[in-house]
């Protein structure tokens, strides 16, 4: 936990420094900034990026959980198609059994742990030059890589994933969805049967600022009916800026769970720092 907060503080300082650098480079940012912002807001855009996503979950009966997700995006263009490789490598600090967390769908009781969680890989196949709606589909797989059984599912799981979005002049809106079902792993752990729905909207403002709502709704279908759904509501604000020639996207958000299972967090606050490498 202390490591997570120290790294978070370092990234906050980087963001502040970049905002000062942007003030010296506003004219350059204004030129072509819209294209970069559109690419950032497109989950299947053909742009290399390295996001660091911090989330802090509050309100569970046994304490707070925190996550640092390292989420590299590696696009490969093959003819008329983009192959978008997305990896999620979670570092987790958990107080014990906490429900309603997308990355630990079958939590178990314990005294808490800190370390690596289960790694997820998704591949989106998307048209390189879409007309109208932008879309991508492909497989997703979660690997039981957790360093402690409290931080993962101890199950191999896989399933389909897809995204559709639109980018009018004012911003971006769309939906990402994924379903994972377990097919191997520790027989003593509950099976995985989880769907994820992620509606998102970005409203662009001047000088690289934007408003965002990126809601992650989860359904764990094998739980009791009262515990299946976790539904948050909320949003936040973000900004594109540069440090030298390095383009960076930073955003902060807060969400409240209007529907949640027992022993789930009430609130989530997040901060994302995304390093961008346009082709």
Spans of features found by a protein language model:
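Cleavable N-terminal export/targeting peptides
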Residues: 1-33, 37
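Transmembrane beta-barrel domains of Gram-negative outer membranes and organellar outer membranes
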Residues: 24-279
């Amino acid at each position: 936990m202390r490591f997570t907060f120290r790294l978070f503080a370092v990234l906050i300082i980087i963001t502040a420094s970049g905002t000062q650098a942007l003030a010296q480079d506003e004219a350059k940012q204004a030129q072509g900034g819209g294209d970069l912002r559109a690419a950032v807001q497109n989950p299947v855009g053909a742009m290399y990026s390295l996001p660091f996503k911090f989330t802090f979950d509050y309100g569970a009966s046994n304490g707070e959980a925190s996550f640092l997700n390292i989420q590299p995006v590696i696009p490969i263009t093959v003819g008329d198609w983009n192959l978008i490789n997305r990896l999620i490598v979670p570092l987790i600090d958990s107080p014990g059994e906490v429900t309603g967390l997308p990355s630990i769908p079958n939590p178990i009781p314990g005294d808490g742990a800190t370390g690596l969680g289960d790694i997820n890989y998704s591949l989106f196949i998307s048209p390189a030059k879409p007309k109208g709606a932008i879309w991508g589909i492909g497989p997703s797989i979660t690997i039981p890589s957790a360093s402690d059984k409290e931080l993962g599912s101890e199950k191999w799981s896989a399933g389909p994933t897809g995204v559709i979005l639109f980018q009018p002049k004012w911003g971006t809106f769309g939906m990402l969805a994924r379903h994972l079902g377990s097919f191997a792993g520790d027989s003593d752990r509950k099976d995985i049967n989880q769907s994820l729905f992620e509606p998102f909207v970005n409203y662009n403002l001047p000088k690289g600022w934007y408003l965002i709502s990126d809601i992650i709704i989860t359904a764990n279908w094998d739980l009791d009916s009262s515990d299946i759904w976790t539904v948050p509501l909320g949003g936040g604000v973000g900004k594109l800026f540069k440090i030298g020639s390095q383009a960076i996207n930073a955003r902060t958000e807060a969400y409240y769970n209007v529907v949640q299972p027992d022993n789930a967090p009430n609130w989530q606050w997040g901060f994302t720092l995304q390093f961008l490498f346009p082709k």
